[in-house]
Amino acid sequence: MTQLVTRARSARGSTLGEQPRQDQLDFADHTGTAGDGNDGAAAASGPVQPGLFPDDSVPDELVGYRGPSACQIAGITYRQLDYWARTSLVVPSIRSAAGSGSQRLYSFKDILVLKIVKRLLDTGISLHNIRVAVDHLRQRGVQDLANITLFSDGTTVYECTSAEEVVDLLQGGQGVFGIAVSGAMRELTGVIADFHGERADGGESIAAPEDELASRRKHRDRKIG
């Protein structure tokens, strides 16, 4: 496993900055303690389920979502989004706010990282340690992230890439919280389809599906007109 808040080497892992093994993982988000490591090990041995994305392709990194949409998708407040952008914790990779009237545009990967940050915060991890973990994740592509599971004991963040590493961590005798990046990605893929996206290259925007109420209003307006 890779310990993401120091450069210390674990018994079975690599130091931060080395490329860890890309074993296929598919954990559900869960908590665990020593003694119940069998569940984690069983999950770790299974492959990533197919259909992570609807068309089995990587999300278009030229499609961005404005700040308010990114907040709703990731489940955070706009105040959090703005603070994390200003402190360079999670910066929009497609377009930053520059001057009056400009809008930040967040990519699929940006919003995925926002979700991960939120979940790590909810477990009590400090922003300092989260920043180290985010810097590590930022180096990965979207497909690489699908093979990562993050675990935390409330202080340290670990990246696990095999069942053996999960067992080692759970046998430490303290509770841990697991975040399956692949699970967060599937969840995000389903939710993000309901939001309007903008193309950074000036191409056609991706409109959110029209809800039933809006459709009825439009139909009524046509009749009146």
UniProtKB/Swiss-Prot annotation:
Biased composition (Basic residues): 216-225
Biased composition (Basic and acidic residues): 20-29
Disulfide-bonded cysteines: none
Keyword Nucleotide-binding among record annotations: no
MF GO annotations: DNA binding; DNA-binding transcription factor activity
Region described as Disordered: spans on this chain: 1-48, 201-225
Keywords of the record: DNA-binding, Transcription, Transcription regulation
Pfam families: MerR_1
Sequence intervals crossing the membrane: none
Domain HTH merR-type: 64-136
GO process annotations (BP): negative regulation of DNA-templated transcription
Name of the protein described by the UniProt record: Uncharacterized HTH-type transcriptional regulator Rv1830
Organism listed in the record: Mycobacterium tuberculosis (strain ATCC 25618 / H37Rv)
